[in-house]
A protein has these predicted regions:
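Conserved N-terminal substructure of TIR/SEFIR domains
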Residues: 1-61, 80-88, 131-151
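Flexible, glycine-rich phosphate/dinucleotide-binding loops
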Residues: 10, 36, 67-68, 99-101
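A short acidic (Asp/Glu
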Residues: 12-14, 70-74, 102-103
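Short loop/turn segments at strand-loop or loop-helix junctions that form parts
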Residues: 60-64, 94-96, 111-117
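Short beta-alpha junction loops
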Residues: 64-65, 87-101
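Conserved TIR/SEFIR loop-to-helix hotspot centered on a Trp-containing motif
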Residues: 64-85
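Glycine-rich, charge-decorated loop segments at or immediately adjacent to ligand/cofactor-binding or catalytic sites
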Residues: 98-111
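Conserved GTP-binding G-domain of TRAFAC-class P-loop NTPases and closely related GTPase folds
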Residues: 118-132
Length: 151
């Protein structure tokens, strides 16, 4: 599973990543410290497509930083295209942005975004990320089960 997020404050994303890894899902963070992982950015488009398709499940932490960064916009378009083609499963988490204020390039996210409201404290945030991790794991297991029964 790939995890994408460019926000400056990573505690929500780190918490979700820990919960997913605890549940047995290997997570690769595409962005490190608000920047695209250098190895990933040096890949050509074909290699990026292959990497995303190989991992199949993408968790996208949408933030203003991602929407306003050229590298973030590139990866948003990449996951949009691959998701529309059915090559990846995309889970979009709203990282404290107003859905109504999404720029045009992020408008397609409006219908698939999972809203995470502002948390009062770290405990509440951790509980929400735990629940979100549970939901993602259930969806992944259900998807794998459905693939196996169709084959």
């Amino acid at each position: 599973m790939l995890l994408m997020g460019m926000q400056k404050k990573n505690s929500d994303m780190d918490s979700l990543m820990e919960h997913l890894e605890f549940k047995g899902i290997n997570v690769l963070n595409v962005f490190e410290e608000g920047r695209v992982n250098n190895l990933l950015w040096q890949m050509n488009t074909r290699k990026n497509n292959e990497l995303f398709i190989k991992h199949r499940y993408i968790v996208l932490f949408i933030s203003y930083e991602m929407l306003n960064d050229i590298k973030g916009a590139y990866y948003l378009e990449l996951v949009k295209k691959l998701s529309e083609q059915g090559k990846i499963k995309l889970y979009v988490v709203n990282n404290h942005i107003k859905i109504k204020n999404l720029p045009k390039r992020g408008g397609w996210l409006e219908n698939i975004i999972c809203d995470c409201e502002e948390c009062e404290d770290n405990y509440e945030m951790n509980c929400k990320m735990y629940q979100l991790a549970d939901d993602i794991v259930c969806n992944v297991v259900n998807d794998i089960f459905n693939q196996n029964t169709c084959n």
